[in-house]
Amino acid sequence: MKQNSLNGWFKSGAPGVWISGGAVSIAVIMTIGLLAVIAVRGLGHFWPADLIQANYTVPGQENHIVIGEVVQKEEVPRERLKSAGLPVPDQGPEFMTRELIKVGNRDLNGNDFTWIVGEWLKDQATPANLMTIERREWGNFYGTLVNVKQDGKVIAEGEAAWPELQARVERVNKLAAQLKNLEKTDIGAINSGLERIRLHGRKLELEGKLDATAQADMDSGRAELNNRYKDIEARLSDLHAQFNRDSLTARDGNGKELEISIGKVVHAYQPNAMGTLTKVGFYFSKVWEFLSDDPREANTEGGIFPAIFGTVMMTLIMAMIVTPFGVLAAVYLREYAKQNLLTRIIRIAVNNLAGVPAIVYGVFGLGFFVYVLGGSVDRLFFAEALPAPTFGTPGLLWASLTLALLAVPVVIVATEEGLARIPRTVREGSLALGATKAETLWKIVLPMASPAMMTGMILAVARAAGEVAPLMLVGVVKLAPSLPLDGNYPYLHLDQKIMHLGFHIYDVGFQSPNVEAARPLVYATALLLVLVIATLNLSAVWIRNHLREKYKALDS
């Protein structure tokens, strides 16, 4: 009886349902766990951690004071510390505590982080007057504030120094924004104008049309731009003088004083004196700074806005290229091509293209798009700029085309499947009513297959947006000096190199000189890359569902 019940249970298909449900549950748990690890390790970086101050005494050495953030604690065998050369006594517990402390003050100590033995820390405290100074160079400074100076003269010290410092830092950050706007926008526009005049003159010279009138026009335009530059240079000089006017004197844990220009200070805060609400507000301001600012200190500090912008821009251009070409190829293969051996071979080749390693596409993009196609474009349309390449060098356009080539098989397959699902009776009914094949395709078939096209585009975005290997060859760099979209003609600069979130993760994680400082930024950037791809995909899913509902009646 039990055997019959067991056989009936297997025949009912219940085991398959349980196995499938378990597999889905495991996949969901793994995905949530992965995102949780990335989020916790990445987003925790922006929280203003409390500072500790303690006496650290290594046996047989002089005592010194340690100030910093506790980043990590771990239990390690005593023998491991002893083999590392630390003066650990022979007798004692088997395991000892080792702590990673972010001590900052790289210009004084040489290192941002240090490992210490927890048992050798004494008199640990969290004084409210300890401050963190986030600098534009040399990382964080940890210590106490002594005084604030203006033009070398002390204007505030003691308790009055802290509010004065906050006001001066806020003033300096406003000046920094003005300087950045002048240098990138105004001076950038002047440099762009001068370069256009130079190229125009070179073009006229190559064509033999450079006469006195043209030369006078160019000289007039160049003189006007140079006059504008002199005015801006005077404003810049004044702003730089104001920017470097103030300074502060800070003292580290061992009593050494250091004078720091407030122009180099991004934030100054006392985390031990901050309440929970104040920390929450500061946390969100740091997250926004991470999303909207430019990177600093070899990409280990600051923001990643250029990488976000470059990733989104490249993905959108790739989608605009791959979708029409993929759809056209699928329409031809399904609607017009004879279903013979050659067509089957083409389909097999398209399916196999989806399995080609991404780096192969990168090598092809570099060899064909950049050197052959880009070099030809330069010789035909940008001869005046030679020997400096315009499109004959890696850039945004070639990166987008390379990823489009990588993703086009996905769009072809998805669109073909959508076209195959459209009932034959729909086509025959349209033709019977007098429509031509082209009208049937344009008015009936393609609208009904549009959800499948969107599915192909979603898969293409998911495949291409996270690729790094080919982009290293065809247009992505560690640090891009300007964005590919700005206010200078022709506004969208397809020849410019870009930053990319995927490459940024690789660069920060594996090419950074300061590994401990870069580690949380790797997780934060990885989380952001997932969110960017998810946002692009969800937008496409919403459009696909809208189209599916719109043409649902025709399917039935």
Residue ranges and their predicted role:
Residues 411-416, 423, 437-475:
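Transmembrane alpha-helices
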Residues 1-21, 25-33, 39-299, 555-556:
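Membrane-topology segments of multi-pass transport proteins
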